[in-house]
């Protein structure tokens, strides 16, 4: 972590990882326990921070119990940004996601869309359009933009990440226009020797 004094009116704490520069969020999470850092966790964090640097999300994918959601949540906790986990199902519709994204973009929070590939493919197509609108606003560096026909504010700290478990039945393939919005990271069963 660094204190950034160049080019800013108010001094901010900056987290730098490889080329990514993320701002400390000052969101108090309480005195909670932290995740054990393994090479797998480190790889996931580097992918997430690299994705955020280019205004994309991350896509940790792998079997159950590999730490996909927990790694995302713990990085958010480490840089003091609120991360809302949203458990996806085939009941999710595009209007739910529109409200979810609008609220998070205005607050500068992260979301982790857990089991994202459970959502119906028709809904995923609309979600891709929604996320492309948000990414375009982030790339332009604007403070306000029109999201699905409604003007909203946006904070640059916003991040949307998804987790997928490709092995389960009833999962859909992500459309191409959605896949390009997320950097993939393969998660596997961690070495229990490192954790113990």
Question: Where in the sequence are the language-model features?
Answer:
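Phosphate-binding P-loop
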Residues: 40-41, 49-55
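Extended, charged/polar low-complexity intrinsically disordered regions
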Residues: 1-39, 43
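Conserved alpha-helical scaffold flanking the Walker A/P-loop in AAA+ ATPase domains
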Residues: 49, 92-115, 144-153
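Conserved AAA+ ATPase core "coupling" helix
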Residues: 95-98, 171-196
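Conserved nucleotide-binding/hydrolysis micro-motifs of P-loop NTPases
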Residues: 66, 90-93, 117-120, 160, ...
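Loop/turn-to-beta-strand initiation segments
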Residues: 55-57, 82-84, 107-111, 122, ...
